[in-house]
């Protein structure tokens, strides 16, 4: 059986509230945390960590182009709550799998706070790095706010240029490390892609493995996709034009014969420099001059959000923008676009390319 633990963000819609109460104190501050179990399949369950003061807000990690200022505490509480939930199970887990900086403290806590327990001392941890550029770096005094000892402010702990890095903590303390592709596992051990952690990753390369990401070919199958207005396949593209027209309609763009004959270029992406948005910025005039329509779905750095909004305002019949994320619209764009705009600087794996 697999148990997934995640925050109950505002955008999470699931039945039930309250659940098991978990009084939790961190850095002298008390938090009222709820643990709500949600069935998710015959051998899977989801546990939602409820704490409205931390998770019931706009944006998962930030809003308005800025990180939430208390992200260290938000994800420190998540890490503690996940482990406290696991400790309360009848049977301990076979392995604890943490992802990215947001849960980088989980391996740290396993080898510090929970290391005195003879059962938990033997449970291995796996830490997966999805993107090394996002490191969860906070001021050094964050350690005390998380009830972590000052000895962790060291090269073998979380210290990173006189600050603390949750990602580095996960890399240092996990028993095994993975990335989302074999190529990325090699790349992050170089100065070009190591983001200042290449030395540590070379040191730990004996436990580092790249495992290629995948997509659910049932979910992303245009023949059966419920988000598409008509089915199609590589062998029968007849239904694709209905998806294209639906995209144009959703964005308020013309959908007459001329518009349908024009290439539709889609972009479903985080709007950040890594995705090559600086290249789009430099070439925005040439892009706007193309006899093509553009539809964009994503969020990220404010300057790139505003760039696309300005382009849409200047070319309202050919450029449409939605800032945010919409699962159904993402499927519609993937199904209806003729081309995709993907000028990424680098990709740890590249799910959209898949």
Please identify what each model-predicted range represents.
Residues 1-354:
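Catalytic cores of nucleotide-sugar-dependent glycosyltransferases that transfer UDP/GDP/TDP-activated
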